[in-house]
Amino acid sequence: MADQKKVSEAAKEREIKISSSDNEIFLVPRNVIRLSNTINTLLMDLGLDDEEGTNAEPIPVQNVTASILKKVISWCNHHHSDPISTEDSDNREKRTDDIGSWDVEFLKVDQGTLFELILAANYLDIKGLLDVTCKTVANMIKGKSPEEIRRTFNIKNDFTPEEEEQIRKENAWCED
């Protein structure tokens, strides 16, 4: 029993080397990076999950730059002790008003950074970060007209007035 406790404490203290797409290396505590299902699966597949110490070769994260990976690690560090959700996300009502105050402050970034965080959370399979970033974008859209959404996200309207009218007629039932 005491040996198991030592192993779990060692695993908690273990650091994982991760390399960003621009070759910056980060040392991340194992209990922090556990939020990434992608990294967890890789460590298990390579048989590195139970070893003590630090992996010799960094795990490459080719789709994430150092600046974004730093933010992802910061988010994981803040949330590493949160309980892992066991709810089936398909069976519960989607809400966008349940973003914690720390996350609201953390996500006060420019749109480009927000979208890069979404891509990184998706690539690294960090469900909590993906949920909170997508909710932030949903809140940016909520209650806005199509024109306001275009302005918010700098989207060019490529519909002709006739095409727009046709779409309005086909979707009139949505606005009742």
Curated annotation (Swiss-Prot):
SMART domains: Skp1
SUPFAM superfamilies membership: POZ domain (SSF54695), Skp1 dimerisation domain-like (SSF81382)
GO cellular component, one term: nucleus
Summary of the knockout phenotype: The majority of animals are either embryonic or larval lethal. Rare surviving animals develop into uncoordinated sterile adults with hyperplasia of tissues including the uterus and the spermatheca of the somatic gonad. RNAi-mediated knockdown results in a reduction in brood size of the injected parent and embryonic lethality of offspring between gastrulation and the two-cell phase of embryogenesis. RNAi-mediated knockdown causes synapse clusters that are retained rather than eliminated in the secondary synapse region, anterior to the vulva during synapse development.
Gene Ontology molecular functions: cullin family protein binding
Tissue expression per record: Ubiquitously expressed in the adult.
Cystine pairings recorded for this chain: none
Any one GO biological process: female sex differentiation
Entry keyword set: Developmental protein, Neurogenesis, Ubl conjugation pathway
InterPro entries: SKP1, SKP1-like, SKP1-like_dim_sf, SKP1/BTB/POZ_sf, Skp1_comp_dimer, Skp1_comp_POZ
Assembly and interaction partners: Probable component of the SCF(sel-10) E3 ubiquitin-protein ligase complex containing F-box domain-containing protein sel-10 as the substrate recognition component. Interacts with cul-1. May interact with the F-box protein mec-15. Interacts with dre-1. Interacts with syg-1. Interacts with sel-10.
Family: Belongs to the SKP1 family.
PANTHER family in the cross-refs: SKP1
Record-given protein name: Skp1-related protein
Species classification: Eukaryota, Metazoa, Ecdysozoa, Nematoda, Chromadorea
Gene name tied to this protein: skr-1
